[in-house]
From Swiss-Prot:
Role noted for this protein: Transfers a GMP moiety from GTP to Mo-molybdopterin (Mo-MPT) cofactor (Moco or molybdenum cofactor) to form Mo-molybdopterin guanine dinucleotide (Mo-MGD) cofactor.
GO biological process: bis(molybdopterin guanine dinucleotide)molybdenum biosynthetic process
Assigned EC number: 2.7.7.77
Cofactor(s), by name: Mg(2+)
Originating gene: mobA
Keywords: Cytoplasm, GTP-binding, Magnesium, Metal-binding, Molybdenum cofactor biosynthesis, Nucleotide-binding, Transferase
Residues annotated to bind Mg(2+): 108
Major subcellular location class: cytoplasm
Family annotation (NCBIfam families): molyb_mobA
Molecular function GO terms recorded: GTP binding; metal ion binding; molybdenum cofactor guanylyltransferase activity; nucleotidyltransferase activity
Stated name of the protein: Molybdenum cofactor guanylyltransferase
Quaternary assembly: Monomer.
Family of this protein: Belongs to the MobA family.
Organism for this UniProt entry: Vibrio cholerae serotype O1 (strain ATCC 39315 / El Tor Inaba N16961)
Length: 203
């Protein structure tokens, strides 16, 4: 009789999660988006409130106002001086997080669902390098879970000047996590108008 051995499901406690707050926020007039107030709290605090019950290890990727972010969680910064978008934060997270699996979310999504980490963990396969959320219509490339074995490939990718996150996903064993029943999880706030509207709709 041949038996197949299944790998145990990755546990949320065996993951670290990084909140990406290192962008330039040009559509927010250059303001540091994670520190913008929403209903009396900085945006990054809303994200922490959603993630903290799901995972024991949280980090913040920030490239300015690090001392302010340090009040919320340990801060890591990009190693690349040209700030290569979210891949710079992902590179920093993979370099500094204590676990083999490292997840990433943006700092401007206050409606992250309560089982986001569990869904990612349950979707991990033996061959997985990267997992990316999918809302049923589109992939959500900055809601993602990476294994640290991707770090050398990511370093080479950035060193040759590539900056498009989706191109990296095409080069790795990437699979997608179904969030078609929870598309609001990925709602993000990009402009002052969206921020004001969201605050009014969600007092």
């Amino acid at each position: 009789m041949i038996t197949t051995q299944t790998l145990p499901t990755l546990q949320p406690s065996d993951t670290s999660w990084v909140i990406l707050a290192g962008g330039q926020a040009s559509r927010m007039g250059g303001q540091d988006k994670g520190l913008i107030q929403l209903n009396g709290q900085p945006l990054v605090q809303h994200v922490i409130d959603k993630l903290a019950p799901q995972t024991p290890t949280l980090l913040i990727n920030a490239n300015r106002n690090q001392s302010q972010y340090q009040q919320f969680a340990p801060v890591i910064s990009d190693e690349f001086p040209d700030y290569p978008g979210p891949l710079g934060g992902i590179h920093a997270g993979l370099s500094h997080a204590p676990t083999d699996w490292v997840g990433f979310v943006p700092c401007d999504s206050p409606l992250i669902c309560d089982d986001l980490v569990a869904r990612f963990c349950q979707a991990v396969k033996p061959e997985s390098d990267i997992l990316v959320a999918h809302d049923g219509e589109h992939q959500q490339p900055v809601f993602t879970l990476f294994h640290k074995r991707v770090l050398p490939k990511l370093s080479a990718f950035l060193a040759r000047g590539d900056r498009k996150i989706i191109l990296l996903y095409d080069e790795c064993h990437t699979s997608y996590v179904d969030f078609s029943d929870a598309p609001s999880c990925f709602f993000n706030l990009n402009t002052p108008q969206e921020l004001a509207q969201f605050g009014a709709l969600h007092p």
